[in-house]
């Protein structure tokens, strides 16, 4: 398994992955369709450069993705990250893809001195088991996960 940041050079593989994900699990997607030209434009648009998508690739295809943003609080300088999307194709689940995507993400967080990250958890039982396996993470009754990276 290799990891690549989403960019112009691998957008075709990413679009194939999105098509497959929408065919296999349309109820898991946040939209009923996606705009291929719009995605290509957003990758090139400086406004979207604060968004990072890391792709997990196997056999020359995308099998999973994590998307996140870094941000900072001006008042106290606390550096944070927000994970807004994690998805692994069904046939690649339970093989360490999501764990490795989070490992890549946490490596990027550490490189930028990120103090902690947040995500809104899926309430699906399978996803909940995955998030409960995180070490040093806080899970509230709300579907929010917070993990401190500066132990």
What is the meaning of each model-derived region?
Residues 22-42:
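Conserved GNAT-fold acetyl-CoA-binding loop/helix
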Residues 102, 109-122:
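Conserved GNAT acetyl-CoA-binding A-motif
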Residues 71-83, 93, 137-141:
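A conserved beta-turn-beta hairpin within the catalytic core of GNAT-like acetyltransferases
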Residues 133-151:
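Terminal substrate-recognition subdomain of acyl/acetyltransferases
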Residues 53-55, 61-70, 82, 87:
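Conserved beta-strand in the GNAT
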Residues 117-128, 146:
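Conserved beta-strand-loop-alpha-helix junction that forms the acyl-donor binding cleft
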Residues 88, 94-107, 133:
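Conserved acetyl-CoA-binding loop-helix of GNAT-fold acetyltransferases
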Residues 1-16:
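A short beta-loop-alpha structural element at the N-terminal edge
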